[in-house]
Amino acid sequence: MFSGSMVALITPLGEAGEVDYASLANLVEYHIAAGTDAIVAVGTSGESATLTVDEHVKVVLKTLEYAKGRIQVLAGTGANATHEAIIFSKLFSGTGVAGCLTVTPYYNKPTQEGLYQHYKAIAEATDLPQLLYNVPGRTAVDLLPETVARLAKFENIVGIKDATGDLSRVKKTRELCGEDFIQLSGDDATGLDFVAQGGHGVISVTANIAAADMATMFKLALSGQFEAAQKINARLMPLHRDLFVESNPIPVKWAAHQLGLIKHGYLRLPLTELSESAHPVVLQALKDANVLL
């Protein structure tokens, strides 16, 4: 259902802070041409936390419109209030969205039982396929494999994006949830190793600016050609590292602008533009990865 190189798509913004839909359309075409397996719109990299509800919905629907059925589009639907996450999931039902990526509630720090009840309520309220999203470095809660196993019993909870960087979880989650439960890495630096451990792919920040390389790398990996995949991964490692020199998506939006993929690299407060001292760091990473010659 979901596998390979899936991009955690950035949301282009204009000088006044408005969504730049022309650049968004360009990004969709870029990913289709590059062979990206799926687009995840309005997740962390898409600045979901600072878009209005209307903007959130419109960006997803416009991404679908631009894709024209040529690539899968998933919607970020996470919220730290369960009823809001349900509303988002229901809004995208019947639109053509392939599934939802739902981050664990942030700030309010629910228990494992609270996390279970949160996702249970969402699963029971919508028929869309749901991907759990565990990123404790941002949310301050960790969705444990045992809780994932309880949730995997719901037919429409089909997998997880795991951004813990803990490769031991791949095997444990597979043992608890079965081989058909989709496991996607949310950490570019360990994404290839994640697949080597039995994962199905990655939801990637790096793919925003190195889409063809990421798509090729994961096609090779999923066909068992890890040596060839590792050569690409080694070249991309400066990006995996330095696209996080400041908070994501600050560096990747700056890089995408430098590459001409988007018209501007603007963000919304409280995120600020990439500091000048970090410009040479990201620029060198682009050169080392052969993305910028």
Swiss-Prot record:
Active site as annotated: Y133 (proton donor/acceptor), K161 (schiff-base intermediate with substrate)
Reaction catalysis annotation: L-aspartate 4-semialdehyde + pyruvate = (2S,4S)-4-hydroxy-2,3,4,5-tetrahydrodipicolinate + H2O + H(+)
GO molecular function: 4-hydroxy-tetrahydrodipicolinate synthase activity
Transcription keyword on record: no
Marked site (Part of a proton relay during catalysis) residue numbers: T44, Y107
Example of a GO biological process term: diaminopimelate biosynthetic process
GO CC annotations, alphabetized: cytosol
E.C. number(s) listed in UniProt: 4.3.3.7
Domain of life per record: Bacteria
Keyword Membrane among UniProt keywords: no
Record-listed pyruvate binding positions: S45, I203
Pathway annotation from the record: Amino-acid biosynthesis; L-lysine biosynthesis via DAP pathway; (S)-tetrahydrodipicolinate from L-aspartate: step 3/4
Classification via InterPro entries: Aldolase_TIM, DapA, DapA-like, Schiff_base-form_aldolases_AS
Keywords: Amino-acid biosynthesis, Cytoplasm, Diaminopimelate biosynthesis, Lyase, Lysine biosynthesis, Schiff base
Primary role: Catalyzes the condensation of (S)-aspartate-beta-semialdehyde [(S)-ASA] and pyruvate to 4-hydroxy-tetrahydrodipicolinate (HTPA).
Oligomer status and interactors: Homotetramer; dimer of dimers.
PANTHER family in the record: 4-HYDROXY-2-OXOGLUTARATE ALDOLASE, MITOCHONDRIAL, DIHYDRODIPICOLINATE SYNTHASE
Family in the record: Belongs to the DapA family.
Protein name: 4-hydroxy-tetrahydrodipicolinate synthase
Gene name for this UniProt entry: dapA
